């Protein structure tokens, strides 16, 4: 997914982040789950599910032609994306979900066809938003589902493999670990004590996510043959797989553990172009590591997310 340019408000938000008083060893840090967050519901009949919906991992998607407003197949594939979300919602309801919030987490954040979604869900749309692809998550949720996800920029396989921006980002590391969108977003959920329970996408994305965050349910809807090629299920078959894996995930929801990163979090962000790195280095608490990499230390994943929102809001069109 790609972020639109939205520096102004978020830069001022970033300036409000205070530098840590003393450097800490990550191994000695504390859990990112904060006591100030709202308590999760203990009601036996309440089951809240958060869905983060990306597009590159949707059935049949292989190139730009399907994933952006300029693509000749985009309108059709918006329909497939929406249908995958609906398949997940349907199965989640059948398995006992009482509340569902969806974050449209691809491109301009306005991909899902709202008129085709059921009227008993809520939807987060468009940018900017400080928690990015996870906007709306909090400790009241019981589980998170990633739909239409893809492999990371560090993975040599996977359809449309990238991390946050295929146009600008070459690496994202937290405390020395290479991160994918799935792992960053899982850490966002883990901050609030909420586990990821299922992921859908190509075989590479599903396997990568399971290696990083654990044995979550995986709905494989296509098999990567290259960056722009795949062997894919047909839409109706993909919806069946998503329904099946969603039901399985909710049936074993108590088995999953939140993916929690200990603080402080040292983010190293490597970009393709030198100019955004230079500009980011002007901000407080940001260190330029080399011509293409900056380092930022955040006290929790929310601070990291705010910084990423600023950094990835840079427009590639402004490159020299």
Task: Map each language-model feature to its residues.
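Short catalytic helix/loop segments, enriched in acidic residues and glycine
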Residues: 67-87
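Active-site rim beta-loop-alpha module in soluble metabolic enzymes
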Residues: 188-196, 200-247
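Bacterial N-terminal signal peptides
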Residues: 7-16
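Mature N-terminal segment immediately following signal peptide/propeptide cleavage
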Residues: 41-64
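Boundary at the C-terminal end of the N-terminal hydrophobic targeting segment
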Residues: 19-23
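A glycine-rich helix N-cap at a beta->alpha junction
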Residues: 119-137
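C-terminal accessory domains and tails appended to enzymatic cores
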Residues: 100, 238-320
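Active-site glycine-rich loop that binds ribose-phosphate moieties when present
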Residues: 166-192, 201-204
